[in-house]
Amino acid sequence: MREILISTESGSDLPDALVRKYQVYVAPMHIIMDGESLDDGCFPIDRVFDYFDETGRIPTTSAVNEGEYIDFFHKLQDEHPGCVIYHFAYSSVASSTYSHAKLAIEDEGFRDIYLIDTKSVSGGCTAYIAEAYKLIQERKATVMDYAALAEELQALSDRIECQFIPATLTYLRAGGRVSNASYLVANILNLKPLIEINSDGRLIATKKYRGSMRRIVDKFYKDFLRRYDCQKDTLYLMYGKGLAQDVLDRMREIALENGFKDTQYVMTGGTISCHGGKGAMGIAAVTRISIV
């Protein structure tokens, strides 16, 4: 039986406990402030918020580049001779990480590295990797065709649902994603956009919620749980640093009230926080297998 490794990027926001539990290898994306490139996940997230408060500018983000992937994959193969690697990439339409990993694999002629497009971000990637780990554990003792297993793992993308709500549009406006007029109206009416990850992996704004995070948490979570037929193993509770503790507690209460056996908090890291800012709230889940 060959050793199977799981790898991903820091934009997956996989909590440290799950990195250890699933033995995941993480390639850092990058956060750039005043021309200095920092590895995402290797510095306190408060630096992102402090930088914006001090300068009025949001840090920029950059993907893992092809050369970094080549070094990353070589290191894994050198340390684990004969291994098979399944790399779970941040949504290919939301970042160039996927295309850079694909180029690295093709240009360097790597064998036995299979690239999976999660078509998701942050907590959605976390949910994906957790479900993929379970599937790999079920298959690893008998698997003969690693490419076929990769196809099964890619098919999981149809069953991952992820949504989040920024607490403020300030960062989105600073990044040019929201007009000044829209920002002004949203502030006056206390509107917060729902950001959904669609089936292609695109982040799209759909409906709007009105009120504070405390006021909208129940409706947001219950709307999601009514819309999707979720597996009841684990509900992934996404949050940006700064979200009030009572809102965090209520997120978990709603999950348990709706029959989930467990919950997993996922704090958004530098990549998402550069766009969503402080105190965002989100949810991710694995849906049940449809039987036709």
Residue ranges and their predicted role:
Residues I4-I70:
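N-terminal glycine-rich anion-binding loop in soluble enzyme alpha/beta folds
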Residues R2-E3, G11-I32, C83, V93, ...:
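Mixed-charge interfacial surface used for oligomerization/domain docking
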Residues L76-V84:
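Glycine-rich phosphate-binding loop signature in dinucleotide/nucleotide-binding domains
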Residues Y69-L76, H100-A104:
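Short, charged beta->alpha transition segments
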Residues D50-D53, P59, E79, Y209-R210, ...:
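Non-transmembrane, interaction-prone segments in cytosolic or luminal domains
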